[in-house]
Amino acid sequence: TLVDAGVAADTRLFAIALRFLAPERPLRAGEYTFSAGVSLRDAVAKLQAGDTVVRRVTVAEGLTTREILAVIEGAEGLSGPTPEVSELGEGAMLPETYHFSLGDTRGELIARMTAARDAGLTRLWEARQDGLPLASPEEALILASIVERETAVPAERARVAGVFINRLIRGMRLQSD
């Protein structure tokens, strides 16, 4: 509470002060941080503006779905259950840094991650080169994952992808480790 945080001396006094400091603008719910010795006026302004704490979780590229779900499970401030790996499949979530607020659910975050992946994949699929031997955006994602596993050097990825594309055109196996 604001009293526990030292922002207000008393709840009743704070309620009275609100009538004078914020008669027409409601306070917004959320998690806030206040600097030591913050004035009541500044605290109310922050509560009205909704200047809440923004938390974040970073999902690195190259993680499996199981590893991503472990990162999400360990993110402080998220609520709700974490789905099973089998509910999502590999490559379902875009690796990125995601921002969230205290109390957001893991399901909501995962929905944002899958929507971001879908939007990015659609954009890339629509801009792809003609004549590639790939039948769907998902096949392109699988090939991209294989290429990333094959080389850790970004400058080599186009050449490695070219080798795999040529093998697919010829009906050969990819023969990737």
Regions found by a protein language model. Give the residues of each.
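Conserved catalytic or metal-liganding residues and their short signature motifs at active sites
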Residues: 1-175
